[in-house]
Amino acid sequence: MHILLRSLLKEIEQDQSEQSPLKYQFYCDMDGVLVDMDGGFKKISGGLLPKDYEAKNGKNSFWKIVNQHPNFWIELEPLPDAKVLWDYIKDNFKTPPPVILSAGQGNRIVEQKTAWIRKHIDPSVQVIIANSGVNKPQYIINSTEPNLTHILLDDTNKNITAWENSGEGRIALLHKNGADSIKLIQSIISK
C-alpha cells in the first residue's frame, strides 16, 4: 500500500510545478481518515464496528464502552496510509491545514485526540475541536474571505453533506483511503 501511495505521489509531483495558491483552506478529519478508530473499537467490543455495536446494544452504548477504557483515544493506531496522506496535504497547501475533530463526550477525549495528533501526525498542527461532526462548518477559518474555497476531507456522509450545505466555497471530499483521497485533492487543486 505504501509503495502504491509513494509512486502516486511521485506521479502527482511531476505534474505539479508549484504549490496550490492560498485560494484553498484545507481541513482534515481525524477518526477514519488518520486514525483507525474502527480497529480500536473492535478490540474493545468483541469485534464489532461502532454502528453494529450500537445496533445491538442501544444508541449510547458506543460512549458507554469507550468510557470504560480511559486511554481509548490515545492508544489508537494510525491508519496505514495516514502519514503519506498527511504529508501530501501538508506539502500542497501554503496555509498549514488544521485537523478538525469532534469532541465527543468530555475533555479527556479532546486531550487524548489532540495528544494523538501531536504524537502521530504533526506536533505543530492546529487542532480545531468541533462539538459534533455536523457542526464542523461553524469552525471554518477566514469564512468571509473572498475567493477562498474551504475543503474538508472526512469519512462520514452526514459531515460531508453539512459542510457542502454550509455556504458558498465549500467542498467536501469523502475519504475511503489515502490513494483515492490524494487523487481527489489533486483533481481540485490542479484546476
Enumerate the language-model features and the residues they cover.
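Charge-dense, intrinsically disordered terminal/linker segments
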Residues: 1-24, 78, 115, 187-191
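Short coil/turn segments at beta-strand junctions that form active-site/ligand-binding loops
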Residues: 22-24, 96-97, 147-150
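Substrate-recognition "cap/lid" segment bordering the active-site pocket of phosphatases
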Residues: 101-150
